[in-house]
From Swiss-Prot:
The keyword Amino-acid biosynthesis does not apply. Keywords: Antibiotic, Antimicrobial, Bacteriocin, Isopeptide bond, Secreted. Is composed of a ring composed by 9 residues, and a tail of 10 residues. The peptide is threaded when the C-terminal tail is inserted throught the isopeptide-bonded ring. Peptide antibiotic that functions through inhibition of the bacterial DNA-dependent RNA polymerase (RNAP). Inhibits transcription by binding in RNAP secondary channel, where it sterically blocks the folding of the trigger loop, which is essential for efficient catalysis. In contrast to MccJ25, does not restrict access of nucleotide substrates to the catalytic center and shows a non-competitive mode of inhibition. Shows activity against closely related Gram-negative Burkholderia and Pseudomonas strains. Is not active against Gram-positive bacteria. It is found in: Secreted. The record marks R43 as: Basic bulky residue that acts as a plug entrapping the tail within the macrocyclic ring. Residues 1-28 form a propeptide. This is Capistruin. Disulfide bonds: none annotated. Highly thermostable. GO terms for cellular component: extracellular region. The keyword Disulfide bond does not apply. There is a cross-link at G29-D37 (Isoaspartyl glycine isopeptide (Gly-Asp)).
Length: 47
């Protein structure tokens, strides 16, 4: 799970514009992933 989150955060940081996060959110219904990228990253401590 941690590896998955790190992978998603990496793809967001590298400019996927949150597409991966949106896909995960709609597939798995994970709360907190439909926020803007910066908010998601800061939520996990990647400020």
């Amino acid at each position: 799970m941690v590896r998955l989150l790190a992978k998603l955060l990496r793809s967001t940081i590298h400019g996927s514009n949150g597409v991966s996060l949106d896909a995960v959110s709609s597939t798995h219904g994970t709360p907190g992933f439909q926020t803007p990228d910066a908010r998601v990253i800061s939520r996990f401590g990647f400020n």
